[in-house]
Amino acid sequence: MARFQMSNLVGDPFALATVSIGMLAWIIGVVSCSIAHTKEVVPNFFWWSIAYQLCVLVGVAVVMGSNTSHIYGTAVVGYAAAGLVCTTFTLDSLVTSKQGARQSAGAGLILLAMTDIVWIFYFGSTSQSGPRAYIDSFAPHKEQPHSYRNSKPISHSYTPRPETTVSSAHPHMYSSAPLSGFETSSPMTGFNPAAASTTGLQPVLGSQTNASTVGGETGEVGQPTEYPYRAKAIYSYEANPDDANEISFTKHEILEVSDVSGRWWQAKKSTGETGIAPSNYLILL
């Protein structure tokens, strides 16, 4: 579980600025309305809005301090939107008042509403969006969007992807080494050795006819039918356009994996698309 670190909050200019402005606006609203309450009763809904906004402020500070915005971003958007609605309803009775303390409290709530709008836009955008990527570029501890060809996790000694032909999956299918006696390695059915001896015809091993079909089936290896593992993408990956076997995926996308023994994993997306993916871009769940 991610832990709260003050360095994440202080080292992120956006987080530090928005949380600081929100806390300052909250203090202005509470102090001003407390003063106004001594002269005139303040609606109870205002105190509920102030208490709710404090919870939103603390929640956003914890999320940014623990660097878990990619996990709780959707929840923050919902809570900030609800806080924006509460603040907007409270503003009317404060800004239109002739009392200075109430107007000051209204100014504080306006700042809170503006902060909520900024948070809704930030947390509601994906990390691949231009504005958010630009904002996150000022925070060194945040992950940046990666491209497969420009990313550092891939080393130059990365092994090639596995072959998907019959010869690699079954290296002895067309070899006569495992056989003995007068047996033939030809996968053709209906071959009669006695008839071949009388006609003088001999099977040619490794011929085009032998490798083309096996009982009417093509020589390509079928896709796996079971995907017992689930993996999460820790980086975005763009498939090589020259290789139809690779698949593209985005950061934090969940994939189903059939085998985790090699450097390239056979994966299946939620859309049903299948292909191979680099294992160091994924983490098992």
UniProtKB/Swiss-Prot annotation:
Gene3D superfamilies reported for this sequence: SH3 Domains
Spell out the SUPFAM superfamilies in the cross-references: SH3-domain
The organism's superkingdom is given as Eukaryota
Q: Which residues form the SH3 domain?
A: 226-285
Which parts of the chain does the record assign to the membrane side Cytoplasmic? 1-12, 66-70, 125-285
The record's comment on protein family reads: Belongs to the SHO1 family.
Question: Main role?
Answer: Plasma membrane osmosensor that activates the high osmolarity glycerol (HOG) MAPK signaling pathway in response to high osmolarity.
Q: Which keywords appear in this protein's UniProt record, sorted alphabetically?
A: Cell membrane, Membrane, SH3 domain, Stress response, Transmembrane, Transmembrane helix
GO CC terms, sorted: plasma membrane
- Provide the topology term for how it sits in the membrane: Multi-pass membrane protein
Protein's cellular compartments: Cell membrane
Region of interest (Disordered), residue spans:
141-170
* Predominant location category: membrane
Q: PROSITE patterns of this UniProt entry?
A: SH3
Which portions of the chain have biased composition (kind: Polar residues)?
Answer: 147-168
Extracellular compartment residues: 34-44, 92-103
Instruction: Spell out the subunit comment.
Output: Forms homooligomers.
- UniProt keyword Membrane present: yes
UniProt cross-references to CDD domains, sorted A to Z? SH3_Sho1p (cd11855)
Protein name in UniProt:
High osmolarity signaling protein SHO1
Q: Where are the transmembrane segments?
A: 13-33, 45-65, 71-91, 104-124
Q: Which Pfam families is this protein grouped with?
A: SH3_1 (PF00018)
